Amino acid sequence: MEQNKCALVTGSSRGVGKAAAIRLAENGYNIVINYARSKKAALETAEEIEKLGVKVLVVKANVGQPAKIKEMFQQIDETFGRLDVFVNNAASGVLRPVMELEETHWDWTMNINAKALLFCAQEAAKLMEKNGGGHIVSISSLGSIRYLENYTTVGVSKAALEALTRYLAVELSPKQIIVNAVSGGAIDTDALKHFPNREDLLEDARQNTPAGRMVEIKDMVDTVEFLVSSKADMIRGQTIIVDGGRSLLV
């Protein structure tokens, strides 16, 4: 019997990460759930996924720390011996005006949102190439290409993530590893609750999205599912914007 493929989704205890992990499990992947603080939510997600008949590994790791990344991938190798899909979803950030930002705010955000992709991708590639390749998909946001209030650290980190996606796509292609990103418009998740202007963002999305509705978690996950399929093999180094057309109206 063919061994189940394995997918790692960072920051997968809730929101888009949780939904992506569940979708991949529905497609038969064994799942690695990663969390930094939400242990209870991570275990609940694992229990939900196990009911789908696949194996689950839960790993606590702050992906902003390369040493923790190495430990996480060592656990993946020991448990599953392979990795086929890596969804780089974990994100954090300090939401303040430019003049109020401190070095610690910058470093925290860049480490988790940008540096993590590089060092996770290095470790993921080592496992993926043993089984003929794989897919890496990162989650970005529109703040990478347009101004959002108090979003400086996150926006810059997501711009770095998208640039790194292009470099990884070229350099990992010889290993048959396909790298892309998905950038979403405003989605009503737990993460958005940290925004002081949350209601303004949601109302803007409701009123000014050409598609006539807000982007939902399912829309993001549908795109991730497509990008890790063979149907998307000729899409490389791209950031697919899933915003219902909102970014077209400036």
UniProtKB/Swiss-Prot annotation:
Positions of NADP(+) binding: S13, R14, G15, V16, A36, R37, S38, N62, V63, N89, K158, I187, D188, T189
Lipid metabolism in keyword set: yes
InterPro entries hit by this protein: NAD(P)-bd_dom_sf, SDR_fam
Enzyme class, UniProt record, top EC level: oxidoreductase
Catalytic site positions: Y151 (proton acceptor), K158 (proton acceptor)
Pfam families: adh_short_C2
GO biological process: fatty acid elongation
Induction record: Expressed during exponential growth.
Name of the protein in its database record: Enoyl-[acyl-carrier-protein] reductase [NADPH] FabL
Record organism: Bacillus subtilis (strain 168)
Source lineage: Bacteria, Bacillati, Bacillota, Bacilli, Bacillales
